[in-house]
Amino acid sequence: MATASVAFKSREDHRKKLELEEARKAGLAPAEVDEDGKEINPHIPEYMSKAPWYLKSEQPSLKHQKNWKIEPEPKKIWYDRGKKIYQAEQYRKGACINCGAMTHSSKACMDRPRKIGAKYTNMNIAADEKIESFELDYDGKRDRWNGYDTSTYRHVVDRYDAKEEARKKYLKEQQLKKLEEKNNNENGDDATSDGEEDLDDLRVDEAKVDESRQMDFAKVEKRVRTTGGGSTGTVRNLRIREDTAKYLLNLDVNSAHYDPKTRSMREDPLPDADPNEKFYLGDNQYRNSGQALEFKQINIHSCEAFDKGHDMHMQAAPSQAELLYKNFKVAKEKLKTQTKDTIMEKYGNAATEGEIPMELLLGQSERQIEYDRAGRIMKGQEVIIPKSKYEEDVHANNHTSVWGSWWKDHQWGYKCCQQTIRNSYCTGSAGIEAAEASIDLMKANIARKEASKESPKKVEEKKMATWGTDIPEDLELNEEALANALKKEDLSRREEKDERKRKYNVNYTNDVTSEEMEAYRMKRVHHEDPMRNFPG
């Protein structure tokens, strides 16, 4: 079947070959064996199992189907850390100036910087490191365990063994302690009730279960109570589903909504039921209980702190945000306590049983204070002078007085130059004179403006007796000028009718005289005049 091409076969040989193949496929005859002694699957098609003629294979085999380009599995090779290859006795040209090794430069030297390098002392020449260069295949480059020393895992095993020993020792001490307490109780009271013994057995069972859970996935044998009457078995993390699903607590369609995708029911399905008898109050009960409320407060605090300019983000750095929130709460409580103590110290506490001091009740004390003629305290309580928030006796920018020595128009300033701008340069008496001159000029401008408002000038409007106005009665016209204006109006009307004769360059003024206006009125056609067509 898996042989190469052979010579011509007779019909009988060909029939026997087909029968043998059918028998091998049916399992009636043993499968063909290759040169390595491995069976060849009889169901492999002939075009796959038959070797090409140029291979000249005499025995059946499937080696021609194997990929001959596949390289053997690469070895787990890695760098020999700290391996040295050659130890020189004298400094060589091109070596490291600091240690004298040829395999690296002085910038990449990992030895301690020497006060005088090996290049100049020619002593204590460091050995050359073993530099390896090998190419890894695709899987070798991505093998995270390549080069891992398995002997280092022994430290992890030792650490876990130590923890296990400490845990067993602690449990043994606790057990001995309980036995001692039990012996002491037996000496005092010999009899114990059956119910207490059952409770002790349950506690022991639960302790065993808790102990087994801490072990690495050990088998847990726990008593299982079933609905059929009680049976025991070996189980692990088994939950008895005897409780009712939350979406079956209330079958009313208009009750609390259940989202099957997220398996959440925010509202209470039984709001009218007794709270003491309910074990489920809706998913909203978890939003304001446990660590959910604290998580919400941390989110609010981080957002407010970020708005105020602090580099704080709950999602980017949750541990930092939680730590800063704890520090903030501690500082807040400390400030609140300090404020409370200050108020108590100043005003007292009316809720206490102690008597209120007489100084607070009567507003006076028995302390004797002596004053001199000027009113200064000579003996007794000294007056505490309030400390200024500004630096005292510091004259900056050529000033001869401090800031706050001048007050005018509800503004502080410098007395030497009477400037109200802080950190300004001193201008001296010239600045004072310039400020007074500007103030005088401003006052003069204000007075002039007020005077102009009180007595405004009457502007006589010049009314023209021409366009759009009635002809005044006292208007006097020159008859000669009026005749010339009439002629000029007739000429302009003729030019309007024949625009070809109009000249390009026109020399005239736009000033309209009274005579020209009168001529325009006389010549124009009054469409609204009912007597315009009446023969005169």
Swiss-Prot record:
Q: Name the domain of life.
A: Eukaryota
Q: Where in the cell is it found?
A: Nucleus
Q: Where is the composition biased (Basic and acidic residues)?
A: 9-25, 488-501
What does the function comment of this entry state?
Participates in the second catalytic step of pre-mRNA splicing, when the free hydroxyl group of exon I attacks the 3'-splice site to generate spliced mRNA and the excised lariat intron. Splicing factor acting as a negative regulator of seedling photomorphogenesis by antagonizing PHYB signaling to promote light-induced hypocotyl elongation. Prevents the accumulation of functionally spliced RVE8a form, a circadian clock regulator mediating the transcriptional activation of clock genes containing evening elements (EE), but promotes PIF4 expression to fine-tune hypocotyl elongation in the light.
Where are the CCHC-type-classified zinc fingers?
Answer: 96-109
Q: From start to end residue, where is composition biased (Acidic residues)?
A: 187-200
* Primary residence: nucleus
Gene (UniProt):
SMP2
List the Pfam families hit by this protein, alphabetically: Slu7 (PF11708)
Gene Ontology CC: one annotated term: spliceosomal complex
- From the UniProt record, give one GO term of the biological process aspect: mRNA splicing, via spliceosome
Q: Which UniProt keywords apply?
A: Metal-binding, mRNA processing, mRNA splicing, Nucleus, Phosphoprotein, Spliceosome, Zinc, Zinc-finger
Q: What happens when the gene is disrupted?
A: Reduced hypocotyls elongation when grown in continuous white, red, far-red and blue light conditions associated with a depression of PIF4 peak amplitude. Increased accumulation of spliced RVE8a form, but reduced production of spliced RVE8b form. Plants lacking both SMP2 and PHYB have short hypocotyls. Reduced organ size due to lower cell number and reduced fertility. Cell proliferation is arrested precociously in organ primordia.
Q: Which residues carry this modification: Phosphoserine?
A: S193
Asked whether the keyword Zinc-finger is assigned, the reply is yes
Regarding protein family, the annotation reads: Belongs to the SLU7 family.
Subunit field text: Interacts with PHYB in photobodies under red light.
The molecule here is called Pre-mRNA-splicing factor SLU7-B
Q: What is the protein's species of origin?
A: Arabidopsis thaliana (Mouse-ear cress)
Region entry Disordered, spans? 1-42, 176-201, 488-507
The UniProt entry, under InterPro entries, shows: Slu7_dom, Splicing_factor_SLU7
Q: What does the record give under GO molecular function?
A: pre-mRNA 3'-splice site binding; single-stranded RNA binding; zinc ion binding
> Where is the motif Nuclear localization signal annotated in this sequence?
486-493
